[in-house]
């Protein structure tokens, strides 16, 4: 009986060692859970970005308005007969007269 109790204690010790510091231990599990959460956040952001790009592609394929808007914003193009005005100026501060 004494041998059986000692064997159970040794077995319990080995299992505890494996649980806390061996391969696939609890600390490793918690680290992996954090990595999974970070990866899922990154995947969600990338999925959102992909959705925006898909919508932009569909918009570009379907009509000329998106192409025209892109040409105006990115290439600085102007329609025929339009006048383009560029307002250039830095920060203008209004100074009040000192009394």
Curated annotation (Swiss-Prot):
Extract the Pfam families matched here.
DivIC (PF04977)
Q: Among the record's GO biological process terms, what is one?
A: FtsZ-dependent cytokinesis
**What is its subcellular localisation?**
Cell inner membrane
- Protein name (record): Cell division protein FtsB
Species per Swiss-Prot/TrEMBL record = Shewanella sp. (strain MR-4)
The alphabetized UniProt keywords are: Cell cycle, Cell division, Cell inner membrane, Cell membrane, Coiled coil, Membrane, Transmembrane, Transmembrane helix
Q: Which domain of life is it from?
A: Bacteria
GO CC, alphabetical: cell division site; cell septum; plasma membrane
What is this protein for, i.e. what is its function? Answer: Essential cell division protein. May link together the upstream cell division proteins, which are predominantly cytoplasmic, with the downstream cell division proteins, which are predominantly periplasmic.
* Similarity-based family: Belongs to the FtsB family.
Has the keyword Cell cycle been applied to this entry?
yes
Ranges in a coiled coil:
31-73
Give the transmembrane region(s).
Answer: 4-21
Membrane topology term: Single-pass type II membrane protein
Give a yes or no for keyword Cell inner membrane in this entry: yes
Periplasmic-side stretches of the chain, per the record, are 22-99
Q: How does it assemble?
A: Part of a complex composed of FtsB, FtsL and FtsQ.
């Amino acid at each position: 009986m004494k041998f059986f109790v000692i064997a159970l204690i040794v077995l319990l010790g080995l299992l505890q060692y494996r649980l806390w510091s061996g391969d696939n231990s609890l600390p490793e599990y918690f680290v992996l859970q954090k990595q999974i959460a970070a990866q899922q956040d990154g995947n969600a952001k990338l999925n959102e970005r992909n959705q925006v790009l898909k919508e932009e592609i569909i918009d570009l394929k379907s009509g000329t308005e998106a192409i025209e808007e892109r040409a105006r914003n990115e290439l600085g193009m102007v329609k025929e007969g339009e006048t383009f005005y560029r307002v250039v100026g830095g920060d203008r501060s209004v100074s009040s007269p000192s009394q």
